[in-house]
Amino acid sequence: MGQLIHTFTVEDTEQIIPKVKEDYGDKALIITNKQIRPKTLNRSALYEVMVAIEESDYEEHLKKQGKSLPAKKSSPKPSSTSLAEEKIRSQIPQEDEDVVLDFSNTRLNTNLNTVKNNDLAKKTYQDFPQNKINPHQNKTLGFDDFKEKLSEVSNEISKVTNTPLENYTPNPNYNKKIENFEKQFEKQINKLNDKIDLLADMMWDDKAEARKNLMIPPEFASIYKQAKESGMLENHLEAIMKATIENMPAAMKTNKDAVQRYFHSLLRNILPCRVESDIKKQKIMMLVGPTGVGKTTTLAKLAFRYAYGDKRYKTGIITLDTYRIGAVEQLFQYAKMMKLPIIDSIEPKDLDEAIKSLNNCEVILVDTIGNSQYDQSKLAKTKEFLMHSNAEIDVNLVVSANTKHEDLMEIYKNFSFLNIDTLIITKFDETKVFGNIFSLVYETNIPLSFFSIGQEVPDDLEVANSDFLVHCILEGFNKGKNNE
């Protein structure tokens, strides 16, 4: 009885052992396995496996499965595109073919897994020696011939199998096929995009009446949709789109990317932001606004920014809020943690005294009581504090980004008698639309000073930036992305 050598292919290395056990039994020996086809977008990888088994063991395994030993036949001429694979396949039978090796007079005591690794990194498939295998040799070998041939073949196969990927020389025809496929795929995608654009233009023209006779070219459809979904007022959007269409150079109007850039630029110019400059004389900032917009938390963030930022100004705090015990205690706790002086002023006449006691501070932050924009008595009390002070006080109206436009305008109108200098917008992380903020600034023309973008003290505070706000208006707020 002789020894048989079989080859077969699988698409996954995890299939090798189960297939060997199923087809050849537990006594089969895996000589080697190698990848003969890399994985691509539309095809799985392919691995070739060589196994050896005694003919008697193979017959016994087949009997258990109710099968008989296949007839011996010569292997067909291979059609592999790799020179090394052609030579190996001329010696190694194809899938499900048997080779009988004559060991009748001699014992074989060798390890079929022996691998030599000399010059491993230098070997490619094309380096396989042509004199290693005689494609016309009879498949029945004597022991000496078999030992020599099998040793050489195993060595070369092992070198090919273990060749590093970076040293592998792919078949040029295969690369050309992939390149042609990519070109065809790109053409199909471009055709599909053209069809989508055509359909979008047709739908855009059909809906012209719904835009109140606002003649907007299809190239402006995307930016129009973004702006409309942001929540800005319809009349504001109409005015901006008209300005864009009328003033934009004709050569740019057919380019969607150019339209996007121009529209972004126009919005940035509409949104005034106060430039943060070095403090050369004492700066007093009073924060006013309705209940629940985050004035106290924002003041704590500002205190840390001025006291421990790049410039490190001497900073003090005054609170006029004696109604909300919890808020006052919270502010005192913040001041204690930051080691900043803090004074509470109960009566309007006491404000100037409090400011004088913090005369050594370069920045003084004043917290006020939060109240409804409709509570005229408390609003009048805040106005009284300002009237009794001779100091130059910068009044900052704090409003929340998640407040609808109608309420924002009510808040501004009822606080405007305090002579608002800037707007501070809070709670960026609690809304997805910012067109309401745009419309507020568009109507009031009050500059923006700071954005509170989250609840973390002191980190979630940004100096107002029109580019940042425009990005939020058109694309939404993403804390990890917008403030990079």
UniProtKB/Swiss-Prot annotation:
Q: Which GO terms describe its molecular function?
A: ATP hydrolysis activity; GTP binding; GTPase activity; signal recognition particle binding
Q: Where in the cell is it found?
A: Cell membrane
Pfam families noted in UniProt: SRP54
Any one GO CC term of this protein is:
plasma membrane
Keywords carried by this UniProt record? Bacterial flagellum biogenesis, Bacterial flagellum protein export, Cell membrane, GTP-binding, Membrane, Nucleotide-binding, Protein transport, Transport
What GO terms in the biological process aspect are recorded for it? bacterial-type flagellum organization; protein transport; SRP-dependent cotranslational protein targeting to membrane
Which topology term describes how it sits in the membrane? Peripheral membrane protein
Outline the segment boundaries, as ranges, of region: Disordered: 64-91
The residues that hold GTP are 289-296, 367-371, 426-429
Question: Where is it chiefly localized?
Answer: membrane
- UniProt keyword Transport, yes or no: yes
Q: Which SMART domains match?
A: AAA, SRP54
Task: Tell me which domain of life the UniProt entry assigns to the organism this sequence originates from.
Answer: Bacteria
Give start-end positions of Low complexity composition bias. Answer: 67-83
Q: Which NCBIfam families match?
A: FlhF (TIGR03499)
Q: What does this protein do?
A: Necessary for flagellar biosynthesis. May be involved in translocation of the flagellum.
What family is this protein classified in? Belongs to the GTP-binding SRP family.
Can you name this protein? Flagellar biosynthesis protein FlhF
- Species source reads Campylobacter jejuni subsp. jejuni serotype O:2 (strain ATCC 700819 / NCTC 11168)
- Lineage of origin: Bacteria, Pseudomonadati, Campylobacterota, Epsilonproteobacteria, Campylobacterales
User: What's the name of its gene?
Assistant: flhF
